[in-house]
Amino acid sequence: MSRFYRLLIVLLFCGTFVSYSQQRIYPDYNSSSGFELDSLDAYDPLVLDNLETLARVWGFVKYHHPAMADTTIHIDYELFGLLPRVVHAGKAERNRILSEWINELGAFEVDTTFQQELSAIDHILINDFSWVEDTVRLGSKLSQTLSDLRYAISKSNKYVWNEGVTIKLYDDPFPNYDYNHLYDAGYRLLILFRLWNAIDSYCPNLNMT
């Protein structure tokens, strides 16, 4: 069982058994994400695989898509909209939904010049994004979109501040709940997805986690 699956099961039982889009209008998610899971979902291989795939794709888009340069897209709310559509979907349907979602965020230009220069010298990659090339899991279309997105031209990203040798990550604040408020499944998954992707994308000691 993968580290992600173990974290996911623990989380599910915590407290319960170029041209980008115009400004998005989202439902009011302040009181609830509107998404819940039941106890059986923690044992369903389809659900677990869908949630892991969604976590990876969502986080990859968060840190790579040029649409994240401003406040047009609220990436957390995008997740809340995707969860009910993806969680019980078949693999082909899931991949179609995710591929269409990325396309809806807007077109982007690709520049592989840096990668070509990097491949010509000896180097060590701290983080492994080879999973985007897994066409068995992602299908050819989604895999190609993510592979292109890896080299998308982006002037800035509101979730990542690059200050020379220092990288700072930013996330949108949670609603101001009472201290004893129990987050629903959507918000708990958001917490896990944020942590997972921050480590997977930027942790220099990933092999030790």
Cite the ranges covered by each PLM segment:
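Bacterial Sec-dependent N-terminal signal peptides
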Residues: M1-R24
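Flexible, low-complexity junctional segments that flank or bridge functional domains
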Residues: S21-T209
